[in-house]
Amino acid sequence: MARTKQTARKSTGGKAPRKQLATKAWNTLATATGGVKKPHRFRPGTVALREIRKYQKSTELLIRKLPFQRLVREIAQDFKTDLRFQSSAVAALQEASEAYLVGLFEDTNLCAIHAKRVTIMPKDMQLARRIRGERA
């Protein structure tokens, strides 16, 4: 296919128009070889391990701030109406909550490994909480 010269166009805002040349060439190549090429997929577990390494390195909060703040306000409504929170108080609650959840998931994973499994299940979480003494 002959290449055509691209001319500069005035932008009207929004997304830039995509080039059609590459996709046309790709389609003819795919049909000539006998089908559409499948997208690349990693083996099961590879992406999970990559995410584990990524999140173990990071220190940022994993739960979004506004949904957590809404949850805190919703729970506080049950105890007293018209409560106000300093932003630092919500941040401290979020930090403590995430630390608790990470620890609970670590213990849950140990329970699953003890049962000779790699997949955590609700019964692992129940056992972890029971051993901790949080639930009778």
From Swiss-Prot:
Positions of region (Disordered): 1-20
N6-methylated lysine modified-residue sites: K5, K10, K19, K24, K37
Sorted UniProt keywords: Acetylation, Chromosome, DNA-binding, Methylation, Nucleosome core, Nucleus, Phosphoprotein
Disulphides: none
PTM notes: Acetylation is generally linked to gene activation. Can be acetylated to form H3K9ac, H3K14ac, H3K18ac and H3K23ac. H3K9ac could compete with H3K9me and prevent gene silencing. H3K9ac is restricted to euchromatin.
Modified residues (N6-acetyllysine): K10, K15, K19, K24
Protein name (Swiss-Prot/TrEMBL): Histone H3.2
Organism expressing this protein natively: Cichorium intybus (Chicory)
